[in-house]
């Protein structure tokens, strides 16, 4: 599965529009700087390295980000409709977390996270067209996302921190204390982490279906 060069350009333009209509002031300036720095990489990056995971093709990353934003806004509206606690959240909080939940998959300031699979056999037999770049320092995708945002002086609220931290749910061991609280005083006070995790899971499942049914 792949998308056209025209679709890649259209997705990038759509992401830029979301940025320009969501943020303002210093935050907008720095988020634009981040996207300008990584533009070529972001436009062509895959969302995963394995075909049957999701969006393992050029342009897959940006397409996934847009899908997660769409799903996150739908979950946000549904939570509000069902009288869940969302009074501590804004649309900007939700979009911010959806937009940057996988930022770590871009790599570091100079190096891609994914590289073209050097092993032809793995690419063909295992369906892995991409491999992880061994030149990078190892970090979880979430931790690298925080690090990259810090490089561009992009601060976040506590809610936004939780949204990014919890995005991968229990697929990431570091999230266990957030989902298995263990004590009443540790109970999560915001639903942002659940909204983003459900949005990421739903978008990923939808993308996987496009591959499975194509």
Label the model's feature ranges.
Residues 1, 213-214:
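Short intrinsically disordered terminal tails
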Residues 1-123:
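Acidic/His-rich, divalent-metal-binding segments that scaffold phosphate/diphosphate chemistry
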Residues 55-57, 63, 84-212:
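Divalent metal-dependent catalytic cores for phosphoryl transfer on phosphate-bearing substrates
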